[in-house]
From Swiss-Prot:
It comes from Solibacter usitatus (strain Ellin6076). The record marks 182 as: Transition state stabilizer. This is 2,3-bisphosphoglycerate-dependent phosphoglycerate mutase. The active site is at 9 (tele-phosphohistidine intermediate), 87 (proton donor/acceptor). Belongs to the phosphoglycerate mutase family. BPG-dependent PGAM subfamily. Catalyzes the interconversion of 2-phosphoglycerate and 3-phosphoglycerate. The keyword Acyltransferase does not apply.
Length: 248
């Protein structure tokens, strides 16, 4: 049996402000830093060790990973950063408050934009400063790879090459892997691993800063998955994520 650990970054400053973040490179809040520290403590206490780590090119995920590895005395292991693990791009919604957007467009519409599989938020224009083509970290990407908006289906499509070409072979070779990423890039992986339907993925919420463990067979098919930590705390955190797109 092989184990894979996933962790969504700790609470970010825009999570705290209930804003659509996407590819905007905001940092962790004080609470988010504490969540990452607590994740390191529980992983270390449960005896986890990692050989290699994967994360996005966004600082909230990178800093979460750094904090976890530091707390586990594993800062020396290889870390691979990839834009393919970025949060989904929220298009013209990036920077907007979720509750205010729900009040303007309706909770049902915002839930579709946040959680549906194949309906993207409104698109950006290429001259918008939020377009990633203006960011030097993405200068090696092709025009087709630079999103103006993304639905979860798009996020799955950009993530899977990294999984098939890099992460899955590492797990098969016996390496112990941790992935520190984002709510929707991790939803993309969960959908793929568990075969979650397009309808059911709408209700899947991943809380910040809580390690999610997959037990996999030799073909990388899931045998079990569970969060490390207090089940009631995990449940409350998932419900809080689900409530972010509701009017106040």
């Amino acid at each position: 049996m092989k184990k894979l650990v996933l962790i969504r970054h700790g609470e970010s400053t825009w999570n705290k402000e209930n804003r659509f973040t996407g590819w905007t490179d905001v940092d962790l809040s004080d609470e988010g830093r504490q969540q990452a520290t607590e994740a390191a403590e529980v992983l270390k206490r449960e005896g986890y060790v990692f050989d290699v780590a994967y994360t996005s090119v966004l600082k909230r995920a990178i800093r979460t990973l750094w904090t976890v590895l530091d707390g586990m005395d594993l800062m020396w292991i290889p870390v691979h950063r990839s834009w393919r693990l970025n949060e989904r791009h929220y298009g013209a919604l990036q920077g907007l408050n979720k509750a205010e957007t729900a009040a303007k467009f309706g909770e049902d519409q915002v839930k579709i934009w946040r959680r549906s599989y194949d309906i993207p938020p409104p698109v950006l224009t290429a001259d918008d400063p939020r377009f990633p083509g203006h960011d030097p970290r993405y200068q090696s990407l092709t025009k087709e790879e630079l999103p103006l908006t993304e639905c979860l289906k798009d996020t799955v499509a950009r993530f899977l090459p990294l999984w098939h070409d890099t992460i899955a072979p590492a797990i098969r070779s016996g390496q112990r892997v941790i992935i520190a990423a984002h709510g929707n890039s991790l939803r993309a992986l969960v959908k793929y691993l568990d075969g979650v339907s397009e309808a059911d993925i709408v209700e899947l919420n991943i809380p910040t800063g809580m390690p999610l463990v997959y037990e996999l067979d030799d073909d990388l098919k899931p045998l079990n998955r569970y969060y490390l930590g207090d089940p009631e705390k995990v449940k409350a955190a998932m419900e809080a994520v689900a409530a972010q797109g509701k009017k106040k």
